[in-house]
Each structure stands twice: as structure tokens, then as C-alpha cells.
Amino acid sequence: MSGADNLADMGAPLATGYRRFVTRRMVWLCALAAALCLATVVNVMTGPAGFSLGQVIDGLLHPDALEPGAYVILWEVRLPFALMAIVVGACLGLAGAEMQTVLNNPLASPQTLGVMYAATLGASLAIVFNLAAPLGLPETYVVPVFAFAGAIASAAVILLLSRVYGATVDTVILFGIALVFALQALIQLIQFVADSDSLQQIVFWTMGSLTRATWEKVAIVGAVFALCLPASIRQVWAMTALRGGEDYARSYGVAVDRLRLTVLLRVSAMTAVAVAFTGVIG
């Protein structure tokens, strides 16, 4: 038997095992997708004004035939809330998975960068100083805009420092922790000078809620996720190589620092847009 035949015989079990692994993953993905669809339908059906499955399907296919009250409940309340939960969960889930991969730490999350605390600081400033009027922004968007700006600003600081001092795991984590403590101190200072009404609004915002969801906000969060997902898929191989260690990834030609900075930028964008519209959630 030739050497090629020996290699083929040795590789056959590996190929079979890999196919089984991929099949199991696909089965799990299909099952989870079906569970998500079922949970969404049940969520839309459930509430003080309950809908049957037939009413939900008919309302989705023929919205003009619904009574005004039923139309508002289905299309303006329950569907935006349900879809916002899906797209925000997708953004935070993908962001968390990428953070854990590039930092090689199963405990890493978008909060590691201080993005959520920065968003809270931006929202607190908008609430306490009533920045909607002087800037001419719609009142429903002023808090999300400042929350997003704060989150992006904190991410920019982390990215700049990481680029200057090297985007190693220790560098990113230490800068993130330092930024978190600084932001927490500023948030507490804002809360100290806030009046009772503003303080109540800040507390409710930090608790997170889907009740602020609208179709426009769902579209914005969904668009950011749709832009980030293909970029994540393109870098799957490089991130998988990075799980074996930086030296291992570099031996395969992966630019580790550039990959880590790219992922951190993507994670920051997804986290910022999700937190801006729902508050500190997840």
C-alpha cells in the first residue's frame, strides 16, 4: 500500500468526524431558529389583548383588514418590541462571541471595553442637562444619540490607546478596566447633581427596556447588524486561528493586532447602537 493510501486511510475518520460535527451544529442552529420563531409568535400572541395564532397570521398578511385598536397593538407595539429584542440580542450575542475570541477569555463581554458605561454617561448628560432643546434634536432621539456618541467615544479611546501601545490582550483589558472605573465615577457625579426627576429617568434608562422600540429604531439596529455580520463571517478563519494563540495565528499569516482592532471596532459599533436604543441591557 502506498503512502498516499495510508494518508487517505488515516484522514477518513477525521473527515467523517468533521462532517458529523458540522451536521450536529446545523441541527442545533435549525432547532434554535425554530425555537426563536416560536417564541416570537407566542410573544406577539400574549398580552392583555390576546391574539390567536390565526389572528396573528391574518394580521401579518392583511394588516389593512385589522381594526384600528388591533392594528396598533400588533404593528406598533408587539412586533417592534419582539423584533427589537431579536436584533439587539443578535448584536450583543455576536459582539460577546467576538470579544471572547479575540481576547481568548470566556468571561469577556462588550462591557469589558466600557462601552455600556460610556453610553450611560452620554444618556445621563442628555437627561440631566436637557440637551434636546439647544441642539434641536427630536426629544425621542436625543438620549439615544448621546448614548451612542458616548459609547463610540469610549471605543475610540480604547482603540487609539491599543494602537499606540499595542493591541495585546492585557493592554485592551487593562485600558478597558481603567475606563470603566473612570466612567462610573463620572456617572455617579452626574447622578449626584441631578434632580429627582432626572435621577429617576437615569435609573430607568440603566435598567434597560424594549418599550422604546419603534420600526425606525429596529431598522437602524438591524442595519448595523447586517453590515457587521458579513465582516465577521469573513474573519472567522482568522479568529479561529487566534484561539490557538497569537504565535500560532501569526504563523498562518494573520495580522493579529489589526484583526483585534478591527474586531474591537465592530464590537463597539454593535454594542453602541444596541445600548443606545434599549438602555443597559444584556
Q: Language-model segments: which ranges?
A:
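Alpha-helical transmembrane segments in inner-membrane proteins
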Residues: S2-G282
